[in-house]
Regions:
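Exposed, flexible binding/inhibitory loops of compact, secreted disulfide-stabilized domains
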Residues: 4-121
């Protein structure tokens, strides 16, 4: 099942539990999810996909005019009623030599399936 969207919600630390997750490399992304990412990568996106007892959460930042970008996963957490993911796009350092081709930074994380709404921060 593939889902997309986002919601803003105030999360308090007292009901928040950090979850174990894995950042998935390109060859580990399920084919159906990768296909949708390829279709949507030129615009910012958030989506989730579940298969075989795992949940994949994807966050993309749209087209960037150069290379040199990376994404940091700051937190993946669970509350009483939601899952959450917080990511940060990190741009190239000042003066860093970068590829002058358009790039489409995104990250996919994998965790055990939990049936809750996902909050993207």
């Amino acid at each position: 099942m593939l889902l997309g969207g986002c919601k803003s919600l105030n999360i308090t630390d007292d009901n928040k539990k950090t979850l174990d997750f894995t950042v998935v490399e390109r060859d580990g992304i399920p084919a159906e999810l990768f296909s949708v990412i390829e279709e949507r990568k030129s615009e910012a996106f958030t989506m989730s996909y579940s298969i075989d007892g795992y949940l994949y959460i994807a966050v993309g930042y749209g087209e960037k005019s150069t290379g040199g970008y990376s994404i940091r996963v700051d937190d993946v957490y669970e509350t009483d009623s939601n899952l959450g993911i917080h990511t940060t796009l990190i741009g190239p350092a000042a003066g860093e030599a970068v590829n002058k081709m358009a790039t489409y930074p995104y990250v996919v994380v994998k965790l055990e399936y939990i049936d809750k709404n996902i909050i993207f921060e």
